[in-house]
Amino acid sequence: MSDTESPLTVLKARIALLATAIGGPDYTSQIDPPPYQIGDDCLACLKDLKRWFRLVDDNQRRWDVAMAVAEYKILTDDLLPILIDWENKCYLATKLSKGNSDISAHFKNKQYYDKIALNCLQLMVLMTWPLILTEQSSTNQINLYSELKKHQLTYKKAILSVENGKVLKAAIRIAIDVIKLDRLARTPRDNMVLKMVLNFIRNILAIEPGELTITARKNIASKGINSVDTLPPNVTQDDISQSTVISCFKKNKVFPFLLTLGSSMTKEFDQDFINIPLMEVMFFLTKDISQDSLLFKSGELDTAQSENHLSKAGQELNDLLQKESQLKKKVIMNTSTRHSRFGAMLSIQTLDQKRLTVSGSQNLLDNSKALQKIDDSKKSKGRRPMIRNETDNESLPTNLLNVHKKSGTYLPLTISKYLNDFINDFIDSSFNYLLKSVTNYFVTEEDKIISLEKIEYLLFFAWFNKYQILRCQVDKDADIMMISESIKETTFILVSSLLRSSYDSKAWAVVHSSMLAFNELLKLVNSLKKFEDNEDIEYVLSRLFSDERIQLLSNLPRIASTHSLSFMKTSIELTHTVLKILEMYSGDNSLVVESKRRAKKMKSISKEDYERLVNEEGYDPDEAIEILNPGHKTIVINFKRVQSSFFHRNTIDLYINTLKRFNELEYSHIKMIISFLYRLFVENNEETLFYRLDFIILLKDMLKQDGLPRTSKARTHINDFAKYYLSRLKRKLKSSPAWHVGILFPPLNDGVVGYFQKYGEHKMTKESEIYAVQPSQFIPFEQQEMMSENMILDMQIGVLVSTLIDEGSQNLVELVRENVQHLIAVFTSHLEVAGENEKTPNNEAFILKEEYDVNPLHYNRHIRALLQLVGFEIPILKSDPCFYRGTTEFSRLVKCEESITKYLNIPFETPNGLPSSSYLKQQSEKNNSLESDGWKGNEDYDYTDPNIVPDNEVDDNDYFKDLDKSTNIRKEKRTVGIASKKTQSKNKTSRNRKKASFRLPNAIEGKDKQPQENLEVFSKEYISDSDEDDEEILNPVFFENEMYMRWLLDKYNGQLPNDKFLSFGRFVNERLSNNGKVVSDFTSLFDGPVPPIDALPLEGITRKGPDKTLLTLSRVEINESNQDNENTQVNEQVDETSENLTINKNARNIGISHGHVESEADDDEPITKKRRTSAN
């Protein structure tokens, strides 16, 4: 095929024809320059262009149409003149109509021209849409990326400069025609027009120069390429700068249009169409703009006006001049005259008779520079860790997260004033509405949200929160509650869940933005101390102090040292804020959170009051207990324990690696780093983490002549810390000379060696000081953020009870329940005298009714966790008692007793369908990688942690032996109906499912190991799907229970209330255990007596009755299992090679025809099984 017949050539030719037919300058006119004249087929040509965009660029993942349109300059030569001419005609017609709504009399063929204007705007949105390269991008898109970016910069300049950006007025006029309509009269097409106008404004803001490189390694410097090479001809940075955009928006009334949409979002507009585009407009409008540059204190505005505010180019020149001045000082300091260069060569002979030579007089002044020059001359250099850029693998612009970049967007004073006024008006009128709408959209449409939208939402959230906090400090009339939606429960849950999910999926760009948003949220909560009675603030604070949250926040700085400097700074800021807030509520300043249900003021509390509330006033027992008890919940923060979770070696690496780049840090960041190091080194005496050679060299480099400037305030802090640090180091080297070698290597994690390094003596452990095992830790449930505390407690108890029953320790669960019931009786009796004696009950000890070879209170992880949930103080040492404090909430005790009793009688159903132990962290997960959220139980700084088993009780090879302890059920070659045997490690004894059995865990030695019998365990947990031995399917009671369930579901419109559901579970278990008989009273379940099974109609399903086919099917199965002759007759009628039993899980209309059960109501995928047709 010749070049003239290639598809691309044909495409360009057709685009050229369309460009010609749209219109052009009218050279017959006497006006100079000639006016634009649209063609006769202008509207059809514009529609054809839109079809080409959809057909080629959208469907084929190419940018050929966009490139051809750019080459023929359709936007600048056709679309802009058409829209501006339409705007001028509309303005003139409006002026001539003198306020009348109908201007068609002064504008002929207005509807036709309106359609042309709308199509022009649609094409402009397509042509200015942000270009993003992803892993799915085609070769064509990659090749055209840089050229199209330059063309979009040309579009941006033309839009902003042609007649002072009048095309923006035309776009807003199109939107105003829709706004004039009543909300109920608007069609979805009208709402899409509003969304399109917002997208057009968003596109103008988002167009920026392209990246220097588009490879995965974006941090590679491109030699010979600068920012000018990414700009097209005749376009400068000032033409497309943010200040130019803001000035154009001010002239063309874009800001009032945005305020109109934002302030009336929930009343006058369909918010689902405009919330995301409006958020993106606000994000790009404030991107890379410092909040401080927009705020002026009283008296500073006049000073700022007198100063010469430079443009962006001027500010960049000023920065370059400062760098040049610093370089000159270094050159003068290290340069000498030519006469002093003689005798300035140094030569060192090595052991292998080789020589290392350096020359230069500066090497005589500084030994470190001489050694550095020798290292630089080596051919092979050490492996350098690669610094990860968060946006590399997520197809995001590299400048998306430059929140800490010094050279941000510079705005002249007048432009700053324009933007400042608009931002203030937006916060006061629209911010809460917009944030609430976008948050609800993200919660409901979570699966549809892409990473870029998540980042935009989080950065939008962080920027406006920080701005309003600073604004309230400057302007006393500003109200911090104008951003009250930021502390709502839904917003906090969304920000927290984005942080958690992005950390788990290693989406580091979202993690970075989530840390920024969470940090600003905490600062906002901290600034709202005077509103501590606010329930939203109480909710945020109560959830902040959960163990899962602290684990996540302490893990973030551990992985930050391998990321960009901006990521490291954000992690340090977040850690600083978290520790500041936690310390505020530690010690005597306990956090008091009011419960959801207010406490009633009563003069005296007695058993009669409790019975009156339950029997006479109809309160539930839980509600009565909460009314009788104080309505406040006190959260006591163990700040020392929480703080220790941040004291990890990798966290120290983060702070030291960040401090190594002190020339790029601001004073505030250096102060945060020194504050953390002081907290760790001085206040907590964790010296061993700092005795390292690189840290000593870092302090020396910072205090050198070319280190921190002598005028810097941070130099004083560094100097004071260095003096104290060196004095402690000298003392440690004298008392423990082994540290002369120790500073060259990382500290050891071994408990014995680490203890000796830290204290200089061997660790002696007495029998009475042996620690008990660590309680089981939970893996968060699905959507745990949305659950209440009572629901989480109930599910955690269900997990532990079910796991203990599976392990054969049901007797221990019953023992816990007996103790809890005894406590309830003690507390109830105490209520009788509470009115006269306000003393709290005495502490009650846990009672073991029988002797155990090994105390389960010390060595059963699940029992210890269960006792901890109930409220017991579990023993840490062997000599410690286990008791229940009298000050603990009585309502929690009652709830725990009910949950334990419930799950002893009803099996616990896990949300994920796996065994309940899947929600418990295994022992081998305690010391997993840094990416996990678990506490580091054997960290080098925490040798006295009571949760750690002493080293004299653990074999040195236990770490390697633990690798073989996982017992996975083998799926292949499984015998039907017989469970495969679980493999046991040599140190781990078997667990027989007997009530009196309890074995010593592998952390304890010296006990005889009992042999494991080779038994074949018959368990339905491991039976493969087969109907040959499926007794449940053959049991008629099973089908009858199904009939009752469907009858109840139909009665309650497909959803049973929670109390009915629990009652039905007891009803089902009782019928299965009693072969269909019912002994208990289930009147509340059926709102009357239990209907007999025969009383239910036998015909097919109707909307008012359950399906009776299951009853017929159960009777058929009984006959098949009991009568061989009838089975033979059935086999003669049914072809066993083609007969299938199809049961639809959700079907309501089921009929039997020729041995088949087929669904007629639902379209779900059926579960098909072969029906047994042969006699037993």
Curated annotation (Swiss-Prot):
GO terms for molecular function: DNA binding. Residues 375-394, 915-949, 974-998, 1148-1176 are annotated as: Disordered. It comes from the Eukaryota. GO terms for cellular component: cytosol; replication fork protection complex. It is found in: Nucleus. Pfam families: TIMELESS (PF04821). Keywords: Cell cycle, DNA damage, DNA repair, DNA replication inhibitor, Meiosis, Nucleus. One of its GO terms (biological process) is replication fork processing. Residues 983-997 have a biased composition (Basic residues). The keyword Cell cycle applies. InterPro entries: Timeless, Timeless_N. Residues 915-931 have a biased composition (Polar residues). Forms a fork protection complex (FPC) with CSM3 and which is required for chromosome segregation during meiosis and DNA damage repair. FPC coordinates leading and lagging strand synthesis and moves with the replication fork. FPC stabilizes replication forks in a configuration that is recognized by replication checkpoint sensors. Belongs to the timeless family. Component of the fork protection complex (FPC) consisting of TOF1 and CSM3. This is Topoisomerase 1-associated factor 1. The lineage of its organism: Eukaryota, Fungi, Dikarya, Ascomycota, Saccharomycotina. The gene is TOF1.
